[in-house]
């Protein structure tokens, strides 16, 4: 039976009063907050049932990204690999395609590409989580015992941490979870803490004293912080007298993540095991509507994270992804000895569009994440399992792109494609000078330069989801700059002409990375196109950009085009270009909760 949808109605907030702009007689419902992406408050209310979705419901629905069959989703929560099965929990609204009534959705997979949706793992049914079962993590305790720790909100919206266990560990899908009798196990009840800014506990790790640790995002005396806690049994927690790390120049940190990495080694490290000599640690936080991170060391004596480089201006902090990507969560995959990360990509159309579609939000392709050999930044690449969806491979070798050239990549489905291309620079002498101030706002520089403005080296890259007359198209490209003794590469994903629709967010995303062009003249680009979701990986995963696009061309099968291009003054060679059509994955097909 179809679930009732919920209408979103903009409301005007005046002090403590809420005034609806329009309220039909059948509307009754609670007030919902913002969605974490900067969109406004809405009234959550029941709409008439059995309303037919618009064509946009299928036109923009992705073919191989993780999303539920319908309704709202946001943060990934507690991903894990257990007894041969991958589990993905996620923030989910059972009742409609808008933020509110959040429970833990639950899906399982054996290959990270095809997913079966199960009944929600956690629902709002106790005083400590009646306002929502918010984001959390899973930790595998000794003896192979998974345990969920998650944030719950009470009726007054105070936040606290709660525990849940599998009801039956012999069930391969862990379909039922039991909440601890002593929930909440952790409250923000110490001086200087903010009870409504205390959420998103990390996966636990074991310290040198044999005690468990975890971090919780919060505020401490007005500072943003990853608050640190200790426990002997993962049930009873004590706050450490100092945070894992804090900063006085940023907003509250959501969805912190803390994990170990080895420079130049793409093998993952399990935090519940001994960390090898020479390992670094990454501290990730979700802030300013993006995911940022620092690389440093975990000082065991101080029980604190120490960044390699302390940067006060958070505009200069490194990012996991430079596009529409937030609330990411990683986990150690013992199956293939790797660390996997994925994030939430929100819709960038409008709440009324979400209502018409009947769904909102998706998760990015799972990515392997590791530390570059120089120890300065994290690298990411789509997990290899996604390649199982490739079909209809086409290849081109030895292309040469001069200024103004446009080469069409034919015989693949331009709506669902995986494109890998290497750009080899014939000369690096013509690189334009680099201005360090651009690092403060690479998006602004992408917007000012654009793909049509010639430079010394670049722009060169891909034009995707292009209509016949190019009225609609998205550009993913590079520009190369010379900075003293090194080269800086700007990667952009320009959405300003991605759709003819005026009611969309259409920015020009961008990020810089250093590249040793004296040693290696080839810059790689991989772009995964999946209807309204586009993920691009530049320079071997040094910069990643997730974009959401809504072109009208998606309504007409076979009408979109993909091109390689060069608008720079210097000739660019393409020694290898490979592209594939991507098959549709089986992702949370709606068959009811008894699908397995």
Curated annotation (Swiss-Prot):
Temperature notes for this entry: Optimum temperature is 25-40 degrees Celsius.
Annotated catalysed reactions: Hydrolysis of terminal, non-reducing (2->1)-linked beta-D-fructofuranose residues in fructans
Key words of the record: Disulfide bond, Glycoprotein, Glycosidase, Hydrolase, Signal
Signal peptide: 1-20
Keyword Methyltransferase: no
Activity regulation annotation text: Inhibited by sucrose.
UniProt tissue specificity: Expressed in the stem, particularly the penultimate internode. Little expression is detected in roots and in the peduncle part of the stem.
Activity versus pH, per record: Optimum pH is 5-6.
A GO term for molecular function: fructan beta-(2,1)-fructosidase activity
InterPro entries reported for this sequence: ConA-like_dom_sf (IPR013320), Fructan_Metab_Enzymes (IPR050551), Glyco_hydro_32 (IPR001362), Glyco_hydro_32_C (IPR013189), Glyco_hydro_32_N (IPR013148), Glyco_hydro_beta-prop_sf (IPR023296)
UniProt-listed Enzyme Commission number(s): 3.2.1.153
Domain of life, source organism: Eukaryota
GO biological process: carbohydrate metabolic process
Residues the record marks as active site: 75
Function: Hydrolyzes inulin-type beta-(2,1)-fructans and beta-(2,1)-linkages in branched fructans. Has low activity against beta-(2,6)-linked fructans. May play a role as a beta-(2,1)-trimmer during graminan biosynthesis.
Family: Belongs to the glycosyl hydrolase 32 family.
Protein name according to UniProt: Fructan 1-exohydrolase w3
Biological source species: Triticum aestivum
């Amino acid at each position: 039976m179809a679930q009732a949808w919920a209408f979103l109605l903009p409301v005007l907030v005046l002090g403590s009063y809420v005034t609806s702009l329009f309220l039909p007689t059948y509307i009754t419902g609670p007030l919902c907050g913002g969605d974490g992406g900067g969109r406004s408050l809405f009234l959550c209310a029941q709409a008439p049932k059995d309303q037919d979705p618009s064509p946009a419901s299928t036109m923009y629905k992705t073919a191989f990204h993780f999303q539920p069959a319908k309704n709202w989703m946001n943060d990934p929560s507690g991903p894990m690999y257990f007894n041969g099965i991958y589990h993905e929990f996620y923030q989910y609204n059972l009742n409609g395609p808008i933020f509110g009534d959040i429970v833990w959705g639950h899906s399982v997979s054996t290959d990270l590409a095809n997913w079966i949706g199960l009944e929600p793992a956690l629902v709002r049914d106790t005083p400590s989580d009646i306002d929502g079962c918010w984001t959390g993590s899973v930790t595998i305790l000794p003896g192979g015992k998974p345990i969920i720790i998650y944030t719950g909100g009470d009726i007054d919206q105070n936040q606290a941490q709660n525990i849940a266990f599998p009801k039956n560990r012999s069930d391969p899908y862990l379909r039922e979870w039991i909440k601890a009798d002593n929930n909440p196990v952790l409250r923000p009840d110490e001086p200087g803490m903010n009870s409504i800014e205390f959420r998103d506990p990390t996966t636990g790790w074991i310290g040198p004293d044999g005690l468990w640790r975890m971090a919780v995002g919060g505020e401490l005396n007005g500072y943003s912080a990853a608050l640190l806690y200790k426990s002997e049994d993962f049930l009873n927690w004590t706050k450490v007298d100092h945070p894992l790390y804090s900063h006085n120049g940023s907003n509250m940190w959501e969805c912190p993540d803390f994990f170990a990495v080895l420079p130049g080694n793409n093998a993952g490290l399990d935090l519940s095991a001994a960390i090898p000599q020479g390992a670094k640690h990454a501290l990730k936080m979700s802030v300013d509507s993006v995911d940022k991170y620092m690389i440093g060391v975990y000082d065991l004596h101080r029980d604190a994270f120490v960044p390699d480089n302390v940067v006060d201006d958070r505009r200069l902090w490194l990012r996991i992804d430079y596009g529409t990507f937030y609330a990411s969560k990683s986990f150690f995959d013992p199956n293939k000895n790797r660390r996997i990360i994925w994030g939430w990509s929100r819709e960038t159309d409008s709440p009324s569009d979400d209502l018409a579609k009947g769904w909102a939000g998706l998760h990015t392709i799972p990515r392997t994440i590791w530390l570059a050999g120089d120890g300065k930044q994290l690298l990411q690449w789509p997990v290899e399992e996604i390649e199982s969806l490739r079909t209809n491979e086409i290849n081109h070798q030895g292309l040469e792109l001069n200024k103004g050239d446009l080469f069409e990549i034919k015989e693949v489905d331009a709506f669902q494609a995986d494109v890998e291309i290497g750009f080899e620079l014939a000369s690096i002498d013509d690189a334009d000078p680099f201005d360090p101030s651009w690092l403060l706002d690479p998006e602004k520089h992408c917007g000012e330069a654009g793909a049509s403005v010639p430079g010394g080296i670049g722009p060169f890259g891909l034009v995707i989801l292009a209509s016949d007359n190019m009225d609609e198209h998205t550009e993913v490209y590079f520009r190369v700059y010379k900075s003293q003794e090194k080269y800086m590469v700007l990667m952009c994903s320009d959405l300003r002409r991605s759709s003819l629709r005026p009611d969309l967010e259409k920015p020009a995303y961008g990020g810089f990375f250093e590249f040793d062009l004296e040693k290696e003249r080839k810059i790689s680009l991989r772009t995964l196109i999946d209807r309204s979701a586009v993920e691009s990986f530049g320079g071997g995963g040094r910069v990643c950009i997730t974009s959401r696009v809504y072109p009208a061309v998606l309504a007409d099968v076979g009408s979109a085009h993909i091109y390689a291009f060069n608008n720079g003054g210097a000739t660019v060679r393409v020694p290898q270009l490979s592209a594939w059509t991507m098959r549709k994955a089986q992702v949370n097909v709606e068959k009811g909760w008894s699908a397995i």
